[in-house]
Amino acid sequence: MADEIWDVYDVNRRRTGKTVIREQSWGFEKYHLIVHVCVFHPDGRMLIQKRAHEKKAWADLWEVSAGGSALAGEDSWQAAEREVFEELGLKLDLKDVRPHLSVNYERGFDDFYCVIRDVDLNQLVLQKEEVAEVRWATQQEVQQMEREHTFVPYFSGLIDFLWQIRDNYDGAICQGSRATEV
């Protein structure tokens, strides 16, 4: 597998023109961009994935539908499209779709996209190096996983907030965006 190369951002989320190789120590005041895609079923459940056993971070834990680091030259939406396709084999058109939530964290910026799709799990093509399995889960099931420490420990309350976004903006997510399967 080729080394991942990331753009380096400043504290104000501007690309610095520099890049860094993943796993390379790169100092303070340098940030990178990661993305997550939350696929919700029309009935309100979220598609979640179990991270592969071989993953360095959070192996064997459940997490949101897809996510990862933006590669050098990618905008947020491009990284989101690529990650969901690589990990799940699901094509989405997120061009001109703003992230529904952006979180600043110690090492960078994390953009969350929420889409509503009735996805047939049997049609997904899982990236074995990243994803062990997928399933639909209710908010209560994910909350239980968080209590049992079987779900990636995102910021406190973040997962519940994603459901609030889904519940309060589902018209915009469903019809007002171009986040459709292609």
Give the predicted meaning of each segment.
Residues 23-35, 41, 45-82, 86:
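Conserved Nudix-box catalytic region and its N-terminal flanking loop in Nudix hydrolases
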Residues 12, 41-44, 52, 116-121, ...:
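Short loop segments at secondary-structure junctions
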